[in-house]
UniProtKB/Swiss-Prot annotation:
This is tRNA pseudouridine synthase A. It comes from the Bacteria. It is an enzyme of class 5 (isomerase). Formation of pseudouridine at positions 38, 39 and 40 in the anticodon stem and loop of transfer RNAs. It catalyses: uridine(38/39/40) in tRNA = pseudouridine(38/39/40) in tRNA. GO terms for biological process: tRNA pseudouridine synthesis. Substrate binds at residue 116. Keywords: Isomerase, tRNA processing. Disulfide bonds: none annotated. Gene3D superfamilies: Pseudouridine synthase I, catalytic domain, C-terminal subdomain (3.30.70.660), Pseudouridine synthase I, catalytic domain, N-terminal subdomain (3.30.70.580). It comes from Neisseria meningitidis serogroup C (strain 053442).
Amino acid sequence: MDTAQKQRWAITLSYDGSRFYGWQKQADGVPTVQAALETALAQIAGEAVSTTVAGRTDTGVHATAQVVHFDTAAVRPVQAWVRGVNAHLPEGIAVLHARQVAPEFHARFDAYGRHYRYLLESAPVRSPLLKNRAGWTHLKLDIGQMRQAAALLIGEQDFSSFRAAECQAKSPVKTIYRADLTQSSGLVRLDLHGNAFLHHMVRNIMGALVYVGSGRLSVEGFAALIQERSRLKAPPTFMPDGLYLTGVDYPEAYGIIRPQIPEWL
């Protein structure tokens, strides 16, 4: 970037993934978060804008605190990149914060931690009010067993058993710092905090934990699955509906705000 001509901005945004075909802009013009955001940014900047995201999300996956950076020669106040951009965005996307950052800041490569929540409804009948907002199973779940299995995820490990075949990550070794599983009012919440995640990793973990909770897989079997390092013997990938990117960690010097998880989630 020519720092004499352009400024680098970081924005935090939230979106409803059920309205879009994932994050990444596609050649066929289907609605994606990136395409909608870049169109809105261009309206404010008066020039084409290219964005770089902290982590791409798939179709149906939501975000409460995604982080993006972009460069522009346009000189605009902060509110132009928040309220102004929001005025040009379709329903389902909102910019929460904007901040001018150092020219070397990189939304993806400077991130040292990512937070995900999976919201799961466990009920005989799926609530129509939670469709696209939460995953669902009609099975009764043993939360204690699921919690024991989730604890086995913590640490630096090879997570090949939870890696999608099309994953482009250079290494399957990732570090999970926190894996909490709670239940209230029929909703199960899985919170994962790690340095990085493989493609479909959280959804594959959730699928395996549902197997544990329903008795189809023991805690010992879950541990063996991790050690197997093979996707071939793992339970199927769980639905995207309940998956939320809830935060990205950056060095404090960049001043990137990480919003609290909304109370409704």
